[in-house]
Every structure is written in structure tokens, then in C-alpha cells.
Amino acid sequence: MSRRKRTGGAAPPPAGDARAAERPALRLVPTTAGEDRAEDHPSRWARPNLRSVVIASGKGGVGKSHLAANLALALGARGARVLLVDGDLAQANLDLLLGVHPRFDLQHVLRGEKSIEEVLVPGGRNVTLVPAASGVPELADLDDYRREVLLRALGQLEADYDLMLIDTASGVSRQATSFCLAADDVVVMTTPEMPAFSDAYGLIKLLQPQGLARAPHLMVSMAASEEEAEETAHRIRLVARRFLRLEIDSWGWIPYDPALPRALRRQEPVLTAFPQSPSAAAYRALAERLWETPGGEPERTMPTTPERLQA
């Protein structure tokens, strides 16, 4: 994907928020003035400063959790305060990727045994992990009430963070859909392989009529080259435009990199285990585009997502 530098004015911090004036600003798609998405969707988070980004995929094994963990660390290294949420409630793995060992997790919150603050785990580099459980069948399919409890619990943490980054379960579970509908931005990950391509489009097709805050973004991983990644993204965007009347922008691509499974075996993020690897460089470049540094350099912004085409 081309990496163009764009310039533009950052929104001023709220009056009286000295911390907001001192820290950089996340440069995703700007929120429409006066827009109140919480009224449009009862489970949507309503907060002035925190941005929420969900990383989703139609199938497993596309590098979604690697993106969540390493992007969180790369943004944290640039000064962002990141709340990293393991949204795969029954098959959690972000703790393994970060090399941390939580004592409590979201199952304890949902059972009323712990508050959301009590399960937080430092993940390094300004990153705080909200861990989930693994191998707990009751968390695989939460009822509506417990999903709402979970979303509201996460919303209580908004004042202490700049970004909530959520790694959802793969596929089209109700949990994953709920996270997507509650967030500001949804990133759909795919690989150039046809099954992943097909499932990514299927996920977009499922989410599109349900009321996303805006059109999803696309991320291609495990690509052999930039050309292969661009071709994959182009095909999905073309199909979405033709059949869903939906314009999708691209976040970029992550190259195929043997360092990723090696880092996982070491229970370390690739950013720290192999900082000179191609994938680590790609995660840092993505963080640089997402997070502007005050003074000196031009702002780096994500491309503005076009509005949905009118029927």
C-alpha cells in the first residue's frame, strides 16, 4: 500500500483537560460534529476522548492477535495510553503473545467476583491488558445481558486511556458482532488466500446492514509482496463497492514473516523479540501513521473513509 503523508489540523482538547493538550492525538477518521452514536446503538460507547478500534476477521489464523498486540505496543511507544482488550472471551491468547500471566480475567468480572479494574494487567510500553479466559465454554456465547454488562464495564475505563484496541474472536459470533457495533472503527483482517478473502467479505457483508459507526477498514497480512497485498485489498474493495455499495479504505499490509511464529514460541511480541524483522517494521510504520507526534513532523492520518453510497 502507498504510504502518503497528509496534513491537517488536530481537534483541540476539551477545555480543562491538560493531559489531552500534552499528548498526541489518534488520527483516525474524524467523528462528525454533533453525531451521537450512543443514541443510535444502545451498546455503543459514548465518550469524548477515547477512540475504540476493533480488529476482526472472518476466519482464524490471519494474524489478528499479532496485529492487536504489536500495534498496541508500537502505539504505546509513541506515547499513546492503550487499553488492549482480549475480546476472544473463551480462547484468549493475548496474554501469551505479551508474555504476561494474569491472575484474574474477564470471567471473574462477568461472574461478579472482580471489578474490571481488578483484572487489569500491565502489558508494557503504556499498554494495559484486559485479559480473557481460555477453555471456558460458558464465555463462548454470552447472553444479551452479560454482553451488555461487559461493554459497560469496559466503558468505565475510558477516562484513563487514549485508545481501546479490541482483539475479537474470529468469525461472526454475537460477541464479535457486539464489539464491532460498539466501536468507532472496525478493521477487518484477511490474507491473500481465497478462504480468508471470502470470509473477510462475508464478515463485512454481515456487519454492513447492522449499523457500524462507519465503513470498516481493511488490513492484509501474510502477503508475499506489496503488490500481492494491494491486489487482495483491491479485490475486496471492488466486490464491496459492487454488491454492498460500500467504500472501504485500507490500513495497509503486514508481510509474511517467519519471525512471528518464532516470537510466539518465545511468548514475546515480535516488536521486542525481533525488532528488526519485516513485520515489526510494518507494525511501527502503521503506528506512526495512526499516531501523530506534536511538533516537527507533518501529521500522519489514516485516509478518510468515504461515506456510504446512497441507495
Locate the predicted segments by residue.
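Hydrophobic positions on the alpha1 helix immediately C-terminal to the Walker A/P-loop
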Residues: 67
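G-domain G4 guanine-recognition motif of GTPases
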Residues: 58, 191-192, 216-230, 253-260
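NTP-binding/hydrolysis catalytic cores, primarily Walker-type P-loop NTPases
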Residues: 265-311
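Beta-strand-loop-alpha "switch" segments that mediate conformational coupling across diverse proteins
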Residues: 242-271, 283
